Amino acid sequence: APRTIGVDINPHAVAYAHAVNGVETVRSDLFSAVSGKFDLILFNAPYLPTLPEERIDDWLECALDGGVSGRDVIERFLPQALSHLTDTGRILLLISSLTGLLETVSLCAACGADAAVCAEEEVEDGEMLYVLKITRSLA
């Protein structure tokens, strides 16, 4: 049977998603508390470059803090997500131009995955948001 599961490290987000949408939710740091394979994995990663001195110990800030490069969480996510992806599955990953589009695509390639922009939108001050469609490399 198809299974939909929402995962977040923020306990407030997990409780809210379950209450509002009624979907199965799990509090987890990425896939640490998740098992199984999935046909589709969606990830709105913390993608904003954040210097150590800019860090605030707050759940909302945690949702945005992508580390110095903006890719710290994405670097941990990709190998884990690929190990939870079915052979024909795909990942949709939201990133920002501040995160580095080419650098993120290169990370995917280093993990044995192909990545292509499937949607983009300018948000403000020239910042672009991209949705990357990521699949296992066939080569």
Spans of model-derived segments:
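Conserved SAM/SAH cofactor-binding pocket of Class I
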Residues: A1-I56
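Flexible, glycine-/basic-rich loop-and-beta segments that form/coincide
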Residues: S137-A139
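Short glycine- and Lys/Arg-enriched binding-loop motifs that mark or flank ligand-binding interfaces
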Residues: P2, T25, C62-G66, L85
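Mobile active-site "lid"/loop adjacent to the S-adenosyl-L-methionine
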Residues: A45-V73
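A generic short-segment signal for beta-strand/edge and adjacent turn/coil regions
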Residues: N10, D29, W59-C62, L98-V105
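Conserved Class I SAM-dependent methyltransferase catalytic core
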Residues: R71-K133
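Conserved SAM-binding loop
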Residues: G6, G66, L93
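Glycine-centered flexibility motif
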Residues: G36, G66-G70, G100
